[in-house]
Amino acid sequence: MSKKQFYLVREDMLTDAMQRTLEAKALLSAGKVRKINEAVHRVGLSRSAFYKYKDGIFPFHAIAKERIMTFSINLADRSGTLSQLLNIVADTGANILTINQTIPLQGRANITLSVDTAPIEIDINELFERMEALESVERVELVGSGS
């Protein structure tokens, strides 16, 4: 049996049936519907399409739980910016494992941040949004993850 490959794909790149499968699974897991038939009817998906994709597509946060994630972040070189970023991460309940900051060149520094997301209290996407919302943050990328 061959090893399964996993890919991180942006939502807008998924087919309509895949997106609707995720919606149906969310309805079921939230208890908003009790049966698969109800879920697929509500999102406008055939049962056969649901069964085709249900075991192969997952929200990013479901895969990312209990993982160590490594982010590459470009920060403007201003006093207190790294502290603000670290506070955002710490406020989620995540455990910061390593921090590596380059010497600021031409007004910006690169931060490599490894974070244990097992204790995180919010969705991983929300963490991305909070980090990107900082005025001093120019870019946030997930560069690796593992157990």
UniProtKB/Swiss-Prot annotation:
InterPro entries from the UniProt entry: ACT-like_dom_sf, ACT_dom, UPF0735_ACT_dom-cont
Family assignment from sequence similarity: Belongs to the UPF0735 family.
Organism superkingdom: Bacteria
Protein name (database record): UPF0735 ACT domain-containing protein ABC1543
Domain spans labelled ACT: 70-145
Coiled coil ranges: none
Source organism phylogeny: Bacteria, Bacillati, Bacillota, Bacilli, Bacillales
